[in-house]
Amino acid sequence: LNRYEPIPFQPADGIFPHIHDFFAHIFGEQVELGYDYLQLLYLRPLQRLPVLLLVSDERNTGKTTFLNLLKSIFGGNVTFNTNEDFRSQFNDDWMGKLLICVDEVLLNRREDSERIKNLSTARSYKAEAKGRDRREVEFFGKFVLCSNNERNPVLIEAAETRYWVRRVPPLPYDDQHLLAKMRAEIPGLLFYLQQRMLSSHEES
């Protein structure tokens, strides 16, 4: 069963200065990798991607705004989970999503870490809904986690390569209308992603 929903915007040639500045803020010196990440989400939704973890113990960093921007771009293919949702045995409501976002993540038990790692590379998983039998479904979800806890929001071993961790500084400005401005630029962003060459190459 394919639950993927149409993206709510159509690409159109245009500029996206607010999105570009915001991406530069979130991804810093890795901004081209940030565009790669978004481009793969958009054009190759089945591609396996690392677990993106944005951390900062400071306020007004834009982490939640980043999640809301992803929701604006990908619409119903994005779901917001709590820590409790992620730990629940009932997962049918998010098994078919492209992006599973957790704000204020605190999944620092070993079983949490193992589940995230397994899901980040899984091709299929057992979906379970209340009152229904478990069933195996194709899984292509990617995780975006945000936390104010810089030390141990998720248990990550030293040699682990399935996480992409970014420490996000405070925004240099406070713009209450930033998300609305970026939403208006999404068609231009999508057009750019369709034309853009990836800056990185795929590795297993």
Where are the regions that the model predicts?
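Conserved catalytic/switch belt of AAA+ P-loop NTPases
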Residues: 113-135
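Conserved Walker B
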Residues: 104-106, 123, 149-150
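Short glycine-/polar-rich loops that comprise or flank the Walker A/P-loop
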Residues: 95-98, 139-142, 158-164
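Catalytic acidic motif of RecA-like/P-loop NTPases
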Residues: 106-107, 117
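AAA+/SF3 P-loop NTPase mechanochemical coupling elements
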Residues: 90-95, 128-146
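Conserved alpha/beta core segments of nucleic-acid transaction machinery
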Residues: 195-204
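A short helix-turn-beta junction within AAA+ P-loop NTPase domains corresponding to the substrate/partner-engaging
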Residues: 153-173
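P-loop NTPase catalytic core of nucleic-acid-dependent motor ATPases
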Residues: 1-101, 113, 164-167, 193
